A protein has these predicted regions:
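N-terminal glycine-/serine-/threonine-rich beta1-alpha1-beta2 phosphate-ribose binding loop
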Residues: 1-46
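Short coil/turn connectors at secondary-structure junctions
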Residues: 5-6, 21-24, 47-48, 72-75, ...
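Electropositive phosphate-/nucleotide-binding environments in soluble metabolic enzymes
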Residues: 11, 20, 35-38, 60, ...
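General beta-strand structural signal in soluble alpha/beta enzymes
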Residues: 11-12, 19, 27-28, 52-54, ...
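Rossmann-fold NAD(P)-binding glycine/threonine-rich loop
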Residues: 32-47, 54-95
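A glycine- and small-aliphatic-rich helix-loop capping segment at beta-alpha/alpha-beta transitions
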Residues: 49, 71-73, 94-100, 121-126
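Active-site-lining helix/loop region of Rossmann-like oxidoreductase modules
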Residues: 99-169
Length: 169
């Protein structure tokens, strides 16, 4: 890789790592709504560590409980990249919700579907052709199931609804 990783401690026990006194913030890159990612989140927050993730599935399914746990331990829980990674929509929504009554949320929740549907409408091409084109251009994953079946958009919508309206979706 060209990067010397020898100075860094490697662990295979997430619980122990989250409890280490020399760890202030835990960054989760595991993925999945349950299992190791959730175990790590709970362990880090229980230990009062800051926790950062872009894991939209975990935040959609367990975000409210994790937020309560974080508040009890006065530990930061950050997940801005879980929704519209390049746009600070979570921060904006939190700040807007604190000062205003939010009535609606509009937006494109899934870029893959937006590309496919827009191209289908403009060119008349069929879904399969546009999905392959999206994959070739890097807009769609090799396994686009979560995108084209709406799971990705549902996760994002659940997060936005929880922040904007206090709703469990």
């Amino acid at each position: 890789r060209g990067v010397d990783l020898s100075p860094y401690a490697w662990v295979d026990d997430m619980q122990a790592m989250a409890e280490r006194s020399d760890v202030d913030v835990v960054l989760e890159l595991v993925g999945g709504s349950d299992g190791p990612a959730l175990t790590l989140a709970r362990a880090a927050l229980d230990a009062g560590k800051g926790f950062v993730t872009a894991n939209k599935a975990m935040i959609a399914h367990h975000g409210l409980a994790l937020a309560e746990q974080a508040a009890l331990r006065n530990a930061p829980l950050k997940f801005e990249a879980a929704v519209a990674g390049g746009i600070p929509v979570v921060k904006g929504l939190r700040e807007g919700a604190a000062a205003n009554r939010i009535e609606r949320i509009y937006g494109i929740l899934n870029g893959t579907c937006n590309y496919i549907l827009s191209e289908m409408e403009q060119t008349g091409a069929d879904f399969g052709d546009m999905l392959r084109a999206a994959q070739e251009k890097g807009f769609a994953e090799a396994d686009p199931t979560f995108d084209v079946e709406g799971v990705d958009a549902a996760h994002k919508l659940a997060i936005l609804a929880a922040i904007g309206f206090g709703a469990r979706v």
